[in-house]
């Protein structure tokens, strides 16, 4: 399936089809900010002859409540249980971006909130970043490596880097799984206390087992970078301090 998607992307890149999605509408619900994801999806629809609409709750539209069973007497005028079916009725496919709440690691790993929203949509559904996944970005990274002729069995280093604030786990989790699924020798380089959750590592190891790749982790920079074909730098918050920003800064 990944190979087919990349082949399609390459064909459209070489032989554009400006009317392929004529008359089609893509709805884009951004519960969280975006630059590249928002602009790339809109540009993609325009290049294929389709159109899109963007809803960012609280910016020109009502705030949207996501909590199940919430009493609607506070700031939000809409609930996702009504909002998503309505938005889906206006489009041919719906993309949703909704980050992790960052409070309960187990709930975020289970994608509890995102699965609820996905279940409310009766149209083709696109994950534009959830608590633990950013599949479209990972797919684009895979294509970029193919375009640059990075060996399928090459060494891929996912390295933690400093950021002033703790960032979500979605991108590192998606990137790790992508490289493992591609069959690469994947190394997660991170300081003590920043090991990715075992569920994330186990999923990547399972993908590597199928693809013929391997997944490891270390805190030793020299050994991790030796012979690397790709260095992917990304910050993520410490799972040990999940839901506690003050502990993270200490």
Spans of features found by a protein language model:
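Residue-level detector of anion-binding/catalytic polar loops
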Residues: 51-52, 58-59, 93, 124, ...
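Glycine-rich phosphate/diphosphate-binding loop of Rossmann-like nucleotide-binding domains
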Residues: 31-51, 146-233
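Glycine-rich phosphate-binding loop
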Residues: 90-91, 95-100, 218-250
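Active-site cofactor/substrate anionic-group-binding motifs, chiefly glycine-
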Residues: 25, 30-89
């Amino acid at each position: 399936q990944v190979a087919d998607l990349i082949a399609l992307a390459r064909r459209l890149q070489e032989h554009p089809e400006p009317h392929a999605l004529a008359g089609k509408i893509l709805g884009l619900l951004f519960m969280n900010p975006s630059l590249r994801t928002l602009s790339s999806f809109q540009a993609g629809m325009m290049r294929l002859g389709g159109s899109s609409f963007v809803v960012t709750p609280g910016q020109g539209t009502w705030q949207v409540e996501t909590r199940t069973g919430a009493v609607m007497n506070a700031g939000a005028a809409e609930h996702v249980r009504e909002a998503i079916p309505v938005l889906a009725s206006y489009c041919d496919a719906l993309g949703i971006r909704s980050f992790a709440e960052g409070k309960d690691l187990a709930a975020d790993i289970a994608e509890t909130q995102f699965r609820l929203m996905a279940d409310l949509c009766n149209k083709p559904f696109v994950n534009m970043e959830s608590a633990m996944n950013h599949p479209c970005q990972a797919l684009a990274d895979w294509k970029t490596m193919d375009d640059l002729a990075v060996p399928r069995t090459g060494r891929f280093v996912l390295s933690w880097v400093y950021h002033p604030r703790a960032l979500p786990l979605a991108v590192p989790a998606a990137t790790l799984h992508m490289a493992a699924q591609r069959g690469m020798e994947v190394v997660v380089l991170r300081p003590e206390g920043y090991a990715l959750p075992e569920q994330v590592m186990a999923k990547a190891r399972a993908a590597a087992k199928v693809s013929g790749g391997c997944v490891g982790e270390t805190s030793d920079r020299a050994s991790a970078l030796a012979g690397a074909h790709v260095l992917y730098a990304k910050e993520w918050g410490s799972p040990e301090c999940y839901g506690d920003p003050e502990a993270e800064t200490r």
